[in-house]
Regions:
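A membrane-topology feature that recognizes alpha-helical transmembrane segments
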Residues: 1-245
Length: 245
């Protein structure tokens, strides 16, 4: 599952954020993104089915393309492993297999947004309906109820706050953040939106501090907030699961 969503994010980058975006029509791009068989990005050799096996496929190939022997990015098996660990953690905390599975689909789509924002400082808006669907489904399977008045109040508050922030401090926030932050806060729910917000910005500031060049000021340094919003949402869902024990 992790490799599917990682590949999805990378193909969106390739066909929407590179010169190829002008080569294909809207429908042609999505057809390629969803139906093109997995292949080596260097030589184009199609990946055999056995090599698509999570984690094991990477070991079978010894981390290299069998044809051109270029190294396969290590983030594929790492993310596959992390998704498996996440499933086990949520299942052990909640004993709810349907919730644990739906959370993986939710964070698969979160991963797509994290990839596009980290690479291009752009959030994939077409991803929003899927984020909302799997997020609401996960919360329903967890709480056995749909969003209530407090959840909508959290969403409304975040929308108002981020619109004001965007209007009066445009250089410090992007439109994608204005759209995605309220949605993530809505999915985190009350009171876990506090955990989502604080963890997102704490991690973002730490990243900015640690990644800055010598003598570079933090003020004005571009930060892929969508990436850290994704981590913050994961932390908030883990918080829910832990507190429900």
């Amino acid at each position: 599952m992790a490799s599917f969503y990682t590949t999805l994010g990378e193909r969106i980058l390739k066909y929407y954020y590179s010169p190829l975006r002008k080569k294909y029509s809207f429908f042609e791009k999505w057809k390629i993104i969803f139906t093109k068989p997995s292949a080596c990005e260097n030589c184009g050799t199609q990946v055999k089915a056995i090599y698509l096996t999570p984690i094991l496929g990477y070991l079978f190939t010894k981390g290299k393309c069998p044809s051109c022997e270029i190294k396969i990015a290590s983030h594929y098996p790492i993310l596959e492993f992390l998704f498996g660990i996440l499933f086990c953690i949520f299942l052990s905390l909640t004993n709810n297999i349907l919730f644990s599975l739906s959370v993986l689909f939710l964070f698969g789509h979160v991963l797509v947004s994290m990839i596009t924002d980290y690479k291009k400082f752009s959030l994939d808006y077409e991803n929003l309906p899927f984020l909302l669907f799997f997020g609401v489904l996960s919360n329903f399977l967890f709480y056995n109820q749909f969003p209530d008045f407090i959840d909508y109040a959290v969403f409304t508050g975040f929308v108002a706050f981020y619109i004001l922030l965007w209007v009066f401090y445009k250089k410090g926030i992007g439109l994608g953040d204005v759209i995605f932050a309220p949605v993530y806060a809505f999915l985190a729910g009350h009171p876990y939106w506090i955990l989502f917000l604080n963890s997102s910005y704490i991690l973002a500031v730490l990243w900015a501090f640690l990644s800055r060049k010598k003598g570079e000021k933090l003020d004005g340094k571009p930060i892929p907030m969508g990436f850290f919003f994704g981590i913050g949402l994961l932390i908030s869902f883990l918080g829910k699961a832990i507190m429900a024990r």
